[in-house]
């Protein structure tokens, strides 16, 4: 049986340029879907999967991210004094246990693989998860929990996967797999951002990984790949070449690309509609706006 996965890396060093000017002063990961930051969705998912140690790979200007996970005793005291117990519990749920969270700087933006490599000393020789907060996945059972349960049966490396339109393959790492509709599929190869004509399939890697320490050893070589960056996909592909098993996991859930404005807005609406106190007002507004927009077009 493989070792338990208790550590997760969160690469959050990006500049968030697609959300300027907001991200001039606010880290993208702190931007909220309804009333919870993007990064909180990732943390909650990780906790549900049994993660105990949280490693953030950051860059300059991410101080608000660290502050968010810090305790706020003055605010807690004020809420307690005013009897706002429900809000107090919401606030306390964002607190992290002492020693459970670490921050590592990525001094140069050299790619996702490089960001993961920056955390190597905190991972050691253990299997670990990588979670990209931009990918928010709404699921009855959290995506990483689904993967951990599958990983405990397979070992090796595992990546979350979903089918994308052929014209979208150039935006993703794409898996070369045998034709199969199973949730867990054996991966024969991986290609980073291929043109549709060169893509071995339309099964794309999404921002959830469970990886073995051998991937970190591959990243030690610091080979440049697509876009001149150190690609995590390439390091996983090296394991495949050495017959280390790699699996794609078709998760149950809906993925939102919150690195794009349209995906962020879609996620905001979807999560708001799940909230009983917001649903009716929002639906009433949508039912008013959508017909008028359609008529105008």
Annotate each language-model stretch with its function.
Residues 2-8, 280-287:
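Positively charged, low-complexity intrinsically disordered leader regions
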Residues 2-80, 106, 142-146:
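N-terminal glycine-rich phosphate-binding loop and ensuing alpha1 helix
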Residues 7, 52-54, 100, 127, ...:
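Residues at the starts of beta-strands that form the adenosine-phosphate
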Residues 14, 60, 135, 213-214, ...:
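Alpha-helix/helix-capping structural signal
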Residues 30, 101-103, 157-159, 246-248, ...:
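Conserved beta-strand scaffold positions in the cores of enzyme catalytic domains, especially
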Residues 39, 65, 119, 134, ...:
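Residue-level signal for inorganic ion chemistry
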Residues 75-78, 92-177, 219-222:
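Conserved beta-loop-beta/alpha segment of the NTase-like Rossmann-fold superfamily
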Residues 129, 148, 152, 181-284:
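Catalytic-core segments of class I nucleotidyltransferases/pyrophosphorylases
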């Amino acid at each position: 049986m493989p070792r338990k996965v208790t550590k997760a890396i969160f690469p959050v060093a990006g500049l968030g340029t697609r959300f300027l000017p907001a991200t001039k002063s606010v880290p993208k990961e702190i931007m909220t879907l309804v009333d919870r930051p993007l990064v909180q969705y990732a943390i909650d998912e990780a906790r549900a999967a049994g993660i105990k140690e949280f490693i953030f790979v950051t860059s300059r200007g991410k101080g608000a991210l660290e502050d968010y996970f810090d305790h706020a005793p003055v605010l807690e005291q004020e809420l307690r004094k005013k009897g706002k117990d429900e809000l107090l519990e919401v606030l306390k749920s964002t607190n992290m246990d002492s020693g459970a969270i670490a921050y590592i700087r990525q001094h140069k933006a050299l790619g996702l693989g490089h960001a993961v490599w920056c955390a190597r000393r905190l991972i050691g020789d253990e299997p670990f998860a990588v979670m990209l907060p931009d990918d928010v996945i709404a699921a009855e059972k959290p995506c990483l929990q689904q993967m951990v349960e599958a990983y405990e049966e397979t070992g090796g490396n595992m990546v979350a996967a979903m089918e994308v339109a052929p014209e979208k393959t150039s935006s993703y790492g794409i898996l070369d797999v045998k034709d199969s509709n199973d949730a867990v599929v054996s991966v024969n190869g991986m290609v980073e951002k291929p043109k549709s004509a060169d893509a071995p399939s339309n099964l794309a890697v999404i921002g959830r990984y469970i990886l073995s320490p051998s991937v970190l050893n591959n990243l030690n070589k610091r080979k440049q790949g697509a876009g001149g960056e150190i690609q995590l996909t390439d390091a996983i592909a090296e394991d495949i070449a050495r017959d280390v098993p790699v699996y794609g996991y078709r998760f149950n859930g809906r993925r939102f690309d919150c690195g794009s404005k349209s995906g962020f807005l879609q996620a905001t609406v979807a999560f708001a509609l799940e909230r009983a106190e917001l649903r009716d007002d929002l639906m009433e507004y949508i039912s008013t706006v959508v017909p008028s927009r359609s008529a105008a077009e």
